[in-house]
Amino acid sequence: MYDAIVVGARCAGSPTAMLLAQQGYRVLLLERGSFPSDIFRNHALLYPAVAHLQSWGLLDAVIATGCPPITQFSQFMGDFNLTGKLHLPDGLAGIYAPRRKYLDQILVDAAVKASAELREEFAVQDLLWEGDRVVGVRGRSHGGASVEERATIVIGADGLHSVVARCAGAAALESRPTLTWIYYSYWSDMTTAGVEFYRFDDEAMLAFPTNDGLHCVATFGPVDGFSDYRTDIEANFARTLARVPDLAARVAGGRRAERWIGTSDLPNVLRKPYGPGWALVGDAGFHKDPVTAHGISDAFVGAQLLADAVDAGLAGRRPLAEALAAYEAQRNAEAMPVLDGACIAATFGPLPAEMLGLRQALRQSQDDTDQFVGMAVGTVSPMEFFAPANMGRIM
């Protein structure tokens, strides 16, 4: 009998397991895959993610992988490049965009070090119930017999297509249409100047440095164009890239080091994150378009919130259901603005005149430009930046 079973050992599950194990709870951490391994997911460690890694004592391990700090963000929106410097507090060197085979290994190692019990290549097939309460899981290891494990709470950190969410019947509190598709790969022997974002009315590109001297270059567009794009990825990527001559020249001077990775399975959904004996964290409970790159940051924030709530309940400081209700309230309050922002950013078409005017005004002040790009990485509050007094000063 465990205090908690965490299903999924990636960016949401491993930190949740680590934090609970550090409080002395008996935690079973289950992962369908194995480590180290890359997965199709976001790379970005925005400021909230970097700050959590620092507080957990794991940032140095990420830096030790050789992933370079990112200190600059350039944004081209069909008009001109607007480049801002990133100013992170607490002496942090920058944000990072590590390969998941490195980041996920660091996170799962930290969970195991904290005494969580890890089982890799274990597929959860169903939940165990007593009345209306979840009391455990049923699943099997690779090639093994079906087994059952029981716990006070089962936490689903198993991503967008969460088995825990499905079996628990987690309702969608908010569901919006899929807006975009994405394809990306990695290049060697080229350069990027921090994060480079290029948006046109009908498609966009993104480039940034990652581990092993590689640079990720991504292209994305409206979801209704996905079928056509995937028929000839090379030709369509070249066509998009030609719209950014400087980036095209750098890509041409490099070498694509890995296969193309892409999907249009990018729904925008906010699920009920708890019920009797179960809870959700990370993409299992909240998935949004990746254009804002908030996924890992939200997973880390959610892991801390949920671990604190579960600890409060298991330790008897408050009823577990009450603690989980507070977790939901705080998660929803933070998630809704992110969901709204992601859906706006993922909607292609001409930019509003107000945004074009703001960009023109920002060209007159590097400090204001730095604050503007700071919103993208989590160091600046959009409410503060877009406050009437601040807009009046800038415009």
Where are these regions (language model features)?
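Glycine-rich FAD pyrophosphate-binding loop
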Residues: I5-V7, A21-R41
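A conserved beta-strand/loop capping segment in the N-terminal third of enzymes
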Residues: Q54-Q105
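Conserved N-terminal glycine-rich FAD pyrophosphate-binding loop of Rossmann-like flavoproteins
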Residues: S34-Q54
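C-terminal helical "tail/cap" subdomain of flavin- and related membrane-associated enzymes
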Residues: D311-M395
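Beta1/beta-strand and adjacent pyrophosphate-binding region of the FAD-binding site
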Residues: M1-A12
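Conserved Rossmann-like nucleotide-cofactor binding loop
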Residues: A12, F35, H161
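FAD/FMN-dependent oxidoreductases across multiple families
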Residues: S227-V310, L314-A315
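Predominantly flavin-linked oxidoreductase catalytic cores and closely associated redox partners
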Residues: A110-L247
